[in-house]
Amino acid sequence: MKASDLFVRCLEQEGVEYIFGVPGEENADIMMSLLDSSIEFVVCRHEQGAAFIADVYGRLTGKPGVCLGTLGPGATNLLTGVADANMDRAPLIALTGQGSTTRLHKESHQAMDVVSMFRPIVKWTTTIANADTIPEIIRKAFHLAQVEKPGAVHIELPEDIAKHRSLISPLVPASSVQPEPNAGEIAKAATLLRGAEFPVILAGNGVLRAQATDQLINLSESTGIPVANTFMGKGAIPASHPNCLFTVGLQARDVVALAIEEADIVLAVGYDLVEYHPKLWNRGRPKQVINIDTTAAEVDAHFAPEVDIPGDITAALEALAEEIGDQVLVKREQYLSYRETMQQEFEQYVEDTGFPVKPQRILSDVRKALGPDDILLSDVGAHKMWIGRYYQCEGPNTCLISNGFCSMGFALPGAIGAKLSFPDRRVLAICGDGGFMMNVQDLETAVRLKLPMVILIWTDSQYGLIRWKQEAQFGKNSHIDFQNPDFVKLAEAFGAIGKRIQSADQLPGVLSEALEADDVVVIDCPVDYDENMKLSRRLGEIPTTTRLNWLKQTDLFSGCGSDSLEVISSFMEERSYLASELICEKGVDSSEVFLLVDGQAVVHASEDGQIDQVSLEPGACFGEMAILADQPRSATVVAGKNGAQTLVLDGRVFREALLKQPTIGMELLKTLSKRLTQLVS
C-alpha cells in the first residue's frame, strides 16, 4: 500500500481518534489518506493551539494526543505546545511533513532541520527514510510517549517517502507494566516513618497518572500522615478530607509550606522536581526524604532520598500501608492548625462586593458553580497562582494547570481537548487577558465543533503575573500594560456568546447560565490584582513558631529557655529588604540583632574592624558576628537577596525589655558570656 496509507493505518491500530492540526502542502498525502480513515482530523487555526489540544487530550485520557503541522513554519508553530506537553508529562505525538529527500541536502524552500529542532523538547524525534520502517517507528513513538515519565515524541514524514509503496503491515500495540516495588526498600521506608516526629506526604502529578489516589488516601488514613499536593497534583486527596493540607508552591512562607518546613520526613509520591523545586522546601537537605515514583529520583543537591522506591506507585503505596499496619504515626492536632488556617482563608471575601472582583471571590463562585467532576483549566498568569492556592478539588484531573513549562495560551485550546475527552463534563477555562489573546483564534475551532464550554477572562489590561513578580522584587513595575479589544463583541464575531461582569454579585448568575448553555460562552470579568501584593506581604509574615525555631538554631540564643525565647521573639520586628538597601547603616549600635529567615546577608566591618566580609546563611545572627570586630558599632550588614525576610531586634528596645524581665536578662547574659568565652578562646 501507499506509505501515507500505511502511516494512517498504523495510527488507527494505536487507537487514535483525533488528529489536531493545520494541513500543508508537504503533508498532503497524509491528508488524502485520512479521507478513508476512522480518525477525525480537527482543523485548527494555529499549530500551537493544535498542540495544546493534543496536550490536554493526552493528559486526561492517558492516550497520546496527536497533532500535525507541515514543514518549516508549521513545525516551528508546534514547538511551544509540544514542549508544554513534554514538561507536564502528557503523552503526545507531533507529526510534521518535510520536503522531498532529494532537496534536503541543499538550500530549499521552507526546508530546515526539523528533527534537530525538536530534539531538546521531546523524548524522541526521527524522520522516516524508508516506507517499510513506518510500523516500527509509529509503534516505538507511541510506546515512548506513554511509558513513564510520559511526554512528547516527534515524527517527520518527507513528501516523497509518503508516496512510496510498502507491503509491511501495522504492528499490534503491546502494553507494558511498571515493576513491583522492592520489599527491602518498603521496609526501610516504614522504619523511617515509624521513627518520625512529624512526617508529611507531598503528592505530585505522578499519583494522578498512576490512578493511585485511593491507595494514597488509604495510607494517609491508616497512618494519620497529612497530604499536601503540588499544583498538578490537585485532587490526589479530596480537599474535604481532614488529612488534606491543600496545595503547596506559591511562596516559601505559605501556610502549607510551613507545614512541610515543620516536617522531619517528607514522603514524596509521584513528585516531580520540574514543578516545585526541592530547594524551596529542603534547602541544605535538613529533612529525610522517601521517594515513591515511577522512575528513580532525579539527582539534585536538595533532593537525595534516604529511600528511593521506583516502580508501580499503586503497588508501593499498598505495600507501605501493609508494612506499617494500622499504626497512627501523626496526631491530627499536629497539623490541624495549618488546615484550619487555610480553610479560614478560603472563607474570606466569598461575599465581597468590591469591584473589580477580588480573585478569592471569583474562585469561590467558580467552585460553587462547578460540580466535583467538572473540569477547570488554568492558563498561565497571576490567576494561575490564585487557582493553585484557592481552588480546591475533590477528585483527580478536575483542575489542569500548566506548571512544568508554564506556557501562556494553554487554557483555551486545552478546553477543546478536555471537552473532546469528556463530552459529558462541563468545562471552564480561566485565562488572563494576556494568555487569552495568545490563542484566541481557536475560539473559532470550539464554535465550529459545537463544543459547549466557558472561557472566563480575568481582565486587568496588564501582564498581571509579571507585575506581581516585578513589584515583589523591585517595588515597582515596568512595561506591562496593553489595551484589550471589546471581548463581548470579539466573542460574538466568532459566533460565541459574550458576557461582561459589571458587579461582583452578578458573577454567580452569569457563571451558572453560561455553564448550562449549549454554546461557547466568553465572560469578561475585571479582576482586582491589588490583592496580589497583599497576599505576598501576608505570606511573608513570619509566624511565632518559625521565629522560635530560628532563635533556637542561633548560637547566640541556644542557651535560652522556651519562655525566654518567646519574650525575645515578641520584641522582634519583621522587615523585608531589597539587595540595594542597608539593613544596618554605619554607626548604628551593633547590639541590634538580625536573624535572616530567607536569603543571605553579608557583613562588612568598618575600616578599623577585623572583619572584611562574612556571609550569613538563613538563621545566622549578625550580633554574634559583630562581636568579632574591634569596632562593632561601625559594622554594616547588607542583604544579599531581593526580598530577604528578616527578623530585627533593636538593641535599645531589647535592653528595655530585659530590664523589665531581669530573669530573662540574666539568662541571656550568661549565654552571651559563655559565647564570648568560646570566641576568645
PLM features: residue spans?
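A general structural motif
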Residues: 46, 106-107, 176-190, 248-252, ...
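Cyclic-nucleotide recognition modules
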Residues: 564, 611-670, 677
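Thiamine diphosphate
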Residues: 95, 103-110, 299-302, 308-310, ...
